[in-house]
């Protein structure tokens, strides 16, 4: 309109809208690790969403650290506020190490933001780490028993020193790694051989006996070595059972 008349033919005004990058969103995730084994993160472990369909995860920033285990990048402890690239994660550089012999659901966690190559997420998310329990080998402990001259000694399970960091594990058997050298060690009246495994039940039922020589006695009279078993693993180091004969 020129102030008096409108144009006879309408025209079109086209509006171009230039795209702007939208910040991504970090999403809470949980990973499953195993006791005594460092967990190696992958990019997929970090929850990422972006309304810009072509944007992908380019990196993260660790905003708060794990409290129990250790988060490290290429063998160096990660610090709060540290930015870690997608490639560093993809190449296996980001690792979480739980405490030795420790485990649990919701064992540890840290928070992070994600980056799409241009901008960080406005929110931070939590990555929770579950650590599955693994069996730990038990420990055999040196012990001494007191037998009587000319009387076979009948062993009980409590004669064999046993310790296990897994508090629910108990003695399930022993292996005789070195034989007695003076008297005779027998299982159900058959002489025991080096390397023989003997179950808890055989010991509990009175099957394992030691017979000293006739009319013989002494402090530290004889001994043999053994390992203990928790039903899964043997102790790594044998211990000694000493027999005093009075």
PLM region spans:
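Acidic, turn/loop-rich segments in luminal/extracellular domains of secretory-pathway
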Residues: 1-21, 33-40, 45-56, 66-134, ...
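Catalytic-core segments of thiol-dependent peptidases
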Residues: 59
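Proline-enriched interdomain boundary motifs that mark the N-terminal boundary
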Residues: 22-29, 136-143
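Conserved, well-structured core segments
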Residues: 173
């Amino acid at each position: 309109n020129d102030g008096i008349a409108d144009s006879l033919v309408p025209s079109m005004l086209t509006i171009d809208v230039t795209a702007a990058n939208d910040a991504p969103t970090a999403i809470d995730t949980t990973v499953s690790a195993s006791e005594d084994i460092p967990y190696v993160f992958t990019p997929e472990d970090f929850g990422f969403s972006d309304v810009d369909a072509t944007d992908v995860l380019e990196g993260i920033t660790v905003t708060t650290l794990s409290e129990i285990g250790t988060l490290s990048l290429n063998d160096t402890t990660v610090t709060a506020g540290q930015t870690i690239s997608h490639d560093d994660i993809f190449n296996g550089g980001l690792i979480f190490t739980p405490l030795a012999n420790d485990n649990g659901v919701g064992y540890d966690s840290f928070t992070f933001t994600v980056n799409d190559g241009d901008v960080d997420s406005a929110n931070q998310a939590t990555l929770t780490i579950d650590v599955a329990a693994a069996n730990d080998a038990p420990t055999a402990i040196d012990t001494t028993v007191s037998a009587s001259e000319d009387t076979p000694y009948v062993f009980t399970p409590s004669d064999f020193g046993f310790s296990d960091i897994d508090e629910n594990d108990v003695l399930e058997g022993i292996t005789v790694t070195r034989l007695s050298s003076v008297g005779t060690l027998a299982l159900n009246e058959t002489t025991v051989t080096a390397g023989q495994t003997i179950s808890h039940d055989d010991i509990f039922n009175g099957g394992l006996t030691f017979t000293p020589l006739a009319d013989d006695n002494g402090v530290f009279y004889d001994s043999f070595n053994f390992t203990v078993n928790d039903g899964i693993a043997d102790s790594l180091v044998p211990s000694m059972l000493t027999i005093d004969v009075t």
